Regions:
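N-terminal secretory signal peptides
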Residues: 1-9
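N-terminal alpha/beta PP-like core and its mobile active-site loop of ThDP/TPP-dependent enzymes
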Residues: 7, 16, 20-401, 510-512, ...
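Acidic/charged coordination and interface sites in well-structured regions
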Residues: 13
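Phosphate/pyrophosphate-binding active-site segments
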Residues: 40-64, 206, 230-231, 243, ...
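Conserved hydrophobic/aromatic pocket- or pore-lining residues that grip, position, or stack substrates
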Residues: 85, 279, 305, 449, ...
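Thiamine diphosphate
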Residues: 173-183, 330, 390-391, 470-629
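Conserved short loop/turn motifs at secondary-structure junctions
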Residues: 282-286, 433-434, 518-520
Length: 630
């Protein structure tokens, strides 16, 4: 064995020096006596990383706390039934972290390690759309809040309840070094306040308990949106006061706001009298009950339904579904009823047609961020949660139907069934174009995927806008969990985190979660693959790898032609080539089963079949498919 060179430190010499140094600290006169009897707020624990943050030699403090405030915070969190805590670890909530995993046993909530706050928040977004309730997202001060902000905005636009807990060091006198100052704020929730429903900064543990329960109730009352509570580090780390009698508030869900009875009766009259009513559903079905109630209303009236699919509102193979011919349905309509439609202005109707909106969005709105769309002209506006109002509307409709109207409805339903089938056949014909093309057409990819999952209890946990909505056109969807809609705010980076979060929610139900993943979107948040592998979250990811930000390719092409310059250089700044990204290897590097890239459509079915078997064993898998642009 070679001897250490002069000036180098041998292993034994290093260990002797380290041991001697430790002994000197422990045996120093007065070391224990100098320890404070009562820990200051935000007492600094002896962590080695502190040296890197402050540039000073770390000190060892002999301070213990039998019951920190964060233990009580965990009691509050558990009382609300949070299953998961999505987070990237950080010191502004180190006490809450420790209390969750030790005092709370890392159960309900279980700590899910995320590589970025945008991933954590996106996972909570997807989880809530399956489970129907929030997960907890804990983020680190100023920087964590800003990292999470895009995903918070997506959830806000999508009307999804996400519960954020923000760490902070409010007391400036107790901040330890330059990093603590940079990561603290007077008002740490300020960056996201324009796109959350409510927030608070509690000053005591009782205040924390009441505001946390209040925030949960507000988030879960339609229109549902994200909320935030600041959990100050001092409040977490300071011991519970001697003899403290803290009260645990009782959470009682608020009944969703229902429509005024007179307005509901008027809408029922309009629906029964209309010749060609169209029911337009957008974010209607918050739960499986919403889908069932819309089916009952449509069947009762034999009315056309257009599902805008930001939730799974209506079965795709139901004969009254006219989603594949929405423009024609609108053109024929003498009454259009929008049920939680975000952009009712964009639903075109013929002159003289009656228009009715029913949405909880009329009960709450922000002003700075313009997600509320253009102001629509309507003849009747019902400010209410549509899902909660549908039962009374159905009963009001049934009371008004005469035998003559029932016969008319049956005839109308037969005609709609034919147009539905004709539209479905047209979609199948369109899907056959470029069937054997390489790269693979998005229609062929969707069809091959459907062939491998249709006999399973499956759940499509991704947006499908950028694959031309082929799954919505071709697949038989009739359960609420079959599709979770899009991102809401169209922020790039939503797809993979939301899919992983939704897959985690689906896991306990034994469902096969399927993610059709855009390539550029994945590159914002590849660390979500590691989270899926680390926590054994079964998710099948099929890459839509067109090696470009193709939406922007088209935008640049449009501008180039508009400016009279030709579109040949539109690939500059928009392509993901040279080098091409190998997503299978990327997945493998994160511990995920990866196959591909696949460019021959004949190889796609077998590759998906192998990946499905991996997912059914409880692990994530990814198949990289080279695809046509759309």
């Amino acid at each position: 064995m070679a001897k250490p060179s002069a000036g180098s430190v041998g292993r034994r010499d290093f260990l002797k020096t380290a041991a001697a140094g430790t002994a000197a600290v422990v045996s120093a006169p007065g070391a224990v006596d100098a320890a404070p009897q009562q820990p200051p707020r935000n007492a600094t624990a002896p962590v080695v990383s502190r040296d890197a943050e402050t540039g000073r030699t770390p000190t060892i403090e002999a301070v213990t706390t039998d019951r920190p405030g964060s233990d009580f915070m965990v009691d509050v969190i558990k009382a609300l039934g949070f299953e998961y805590l999505f987070s990237n670890p950080a010191n502004t909530f180190r006490s809450l972290h420790e209390s969750c995993i030790n005092y709370g046993g890392n159960r309900a909530p279980e700590f899910i390690t995320c590589c970025h706050e945008e991933i954590a928040t996106g996972m909570a977004h997807g989880y809530a759309k399956i489970e129907g309730k929030p997960a907890l997202v804990v983020v680190h001060g100023t920087v964590g809040t800003q990292h999470a902000s895009m995903a918070v905005y997506d959830a806000f636009c999508d009307r999804v309840p996400v519960f954020l807990m923000l760490g902070n060091h409010l007391d400036a006198a107790e901040r330890t070094g330059v990093v603590a100052w940079a990561h603290s704020a007077q008002d740490v929730a300020a960056p996201i306040r324009d796109y959350i429903k409510w927030d608070d900064t509690p000053a005591s543990l009782q205040h924390f308990a009441e505001s946390t329960v209040r925030a949960y109730k507000i988030a879960m009352t339609p229109p549902m949106m994200p909320v935030a509570i600041v959990a100050d580090a001092g409040l977490q780390e300071h011991p519970l006061p001697e003899g403290a009698r803290l009260r645990m508030p009782k959470y009682t869900p608020a009944a969703p706001p229902q429509g005024d009875s007179g307005a509901v009766a008027e809408l029922a009259r309009l629906l029964v009298a209309a010749e060609n009513p169209v029911l337009v559903a957008d974010r209607l079905a918050r739960t499986p009950a919403g889908l069932a109630r819309l089916v009952e209303l449509a069947d009762t009236l034999q009315a056309a339904v257009v599902d805008q699919k930001r939730r799974m509102n209506f079965p795709t193979r139901h004969p009254l579904d006219q989603s594949n011919r929405s423009a024609a349905a609108y053109a024929d309509a003498d009454l259009i009823v929008g049920l939680e439609v975000g952009d009712f202005f964009g639903v075109r109707s013929k002159p003289g047609a009656k228009r009715v909106s029913m949405t909880a969005n009329d009960l709450f709105s922000r002003s700075n961020y313009q997600e509320f769309q253009r102001f629509p002209d309507v003849d009747l506006a019902i400010a209410a949660d549509a899902e909660a109002t549908l039962p009374s509307l159905v009963e009001a409709v049934k009371r008004l139907i005469t035998d003559d109207r029932r016969r008319f409805f049956q005839d109308r339903g037969s005609k709609l069934a034919k147009t539905h089938q004709d539209a479905l056949e047209a979609m199948r014909t369109a899907a056959s174009y470029a069937w054997d093309a390489s790269p693979v057409s998005t229609a062929r990819m969707s069809a091959e995927l459907w062939g491998q999952i249709k006999s399973e209890d499956w759940s499509l946990v991704s947006d499908v806008i950028f694959v031309s909505w082929w799954p919505l056109r071709l697949w038989a969807m009739d359960k609420h969990h079959h599709y979770i809609g899009d991102s809401g705010g169209y922020g790039v980076g939503y797809g993979l985190p939301a899919a992983v979060g939704a897959a985690l929610a689906n896991k306990k139900y034994g469902r096969l979660s399927v993610n059709i993943q855009n390539d550029g979107d994945l590159m914002f948040v590849p660390g979500a693959l590691w989270t899926a592998a680390h926590h054994h979250i079964p998710l099948l990811t099929i890459m839509h790898n067109n090696r470009a930000y193709h939406q922007e390719v088209m935008e640049v092409q449009k501008m180039a032609l508009q400016h009279g310059r030709g579109a040949t250089r539109a690939s500059i700044g928009t392509k993901l080539e040279d080098p091409p990204i190998d997503y299978a290897k990327l997945a493998q590097s994160m511990g995920v089963h990866g196959e591909g890239p696949i460019s021959d459509p004949r190889d796609l079915g077998p590759a998906i079949r192998r990946a499905v078997e991996v997912v059914k064993r409880g692990e994530p898998a990814l198949v990289d498919v080279l695809t046509q642009p759309r």
